[in-house]
A protein has these predicted regions:
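A helix-boundary/hinge signal
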Residues: 1-244
Length: 244
């Protein structure tokens, strides 16, 4: 939205109309708005119009810090705490190996899915999450140490290859980021046009590389694109998007 108080009032009317037509309620008291540039000087006026607070960066969404910097190992602490909270309520000693395997795949592995979907997650964070999953699988109660019969990497291989099919978080991270690369190439929406104008600039995805100053999200896409291009096929079509 442009830095215009009248436009802000019109936006508030549209949001109120949305509430009336949809029957849904927007909780403005729990919402935050962010002002940039000259709009910061009118932050108080915008806050009064929308009835919400003015937020500052970085902020957290689903436990993950939203900022322009690369994720650090400390940024995964919230997800670790969610792991610990889940594990503290489970009685591993009362569960069979199969029961613990089901909980790992259906619950623990999904707690970090939002972070894996949007960011290149540091290896240190992934190792910590694997530590909690491995400890629950082998030690059940997390206190008495037990000998591990095989490497964790073996357990994360598919069942038809001799593993247990436990989700490989590093591989899942790369696959989820590759999904955004595929959507960028194959679909045409607002966010696709934004990224194309900012980063591609009339080039194809194969011609651009990571550059200093790129956003953390785009840096993750640049690393994931190699996996996608290596396993994918490109349809030439009329040749307008093909580089030889």
């Amino acid at each position: 939205m442009e830095n215009d108080l009248e436009e802000a009032k019109n936006m508030k009317l549209l949001l109120c109309a949305f509430e009336q037509l949809s029957g849904l309620k927007i909780n403005f008291h729990k919402s935050e708005m962010f002002c940039y540039g000259e709009a910061r000087e009118l932050g108080r006026e915008y806050s009064q119009i929308f009835g919400c607070d003015i937020g500052t960066l970085p902020f957290r969404y689903l436990g993950i810090p939203m900022h322009h910097k690369k994720l650090r190992n400390s940024d995964g602490k919230t997800v670790e705490e969610r792991f610990q909270k889940k594990l503290s309520g489970w009685k591993g000693k009362m569960l069979s190996v199969g029961g613990r395997l089901v909980l790992i795949n259906s619950v623990l592995s999904n707690l970090s899915m939002f972070m894996l979907s949007f960011f290149e997650v540091p290896r240190g964070v992934l190792k910590r999450l694997d530590y909690y999953r491995s400890r629950f699988f082998w030690q059940s109660d997390g206190h008495k140490k037990k000998y591990r019969l095989t490497k964790w990497e073996v357990l994360c291989t598919p069942k038809n290859q001799g593993g247990l099919g436990i989700l490989d978080l590093d591989l899942q991270n790369r696959c989820l980021l590759s999904k955004w690369v595929f959507k960028l190439i194959s679909e045409d929406g607002i966010w696709q046009r934004l990224l194309r104008n900012k980063y591609l600039r009339h080039k194809t995805i194969t011609q651009v590389e990571h550059m200093p100053g790129d956003s953390h999200f785009w840096s993750g896409l640049m690393k994931a694109k190699n996996d996608l291009l290596r396993m994918g096929k490109f349809k030439v079509g009329d040749g307008s998007q093909t580089r030889f």
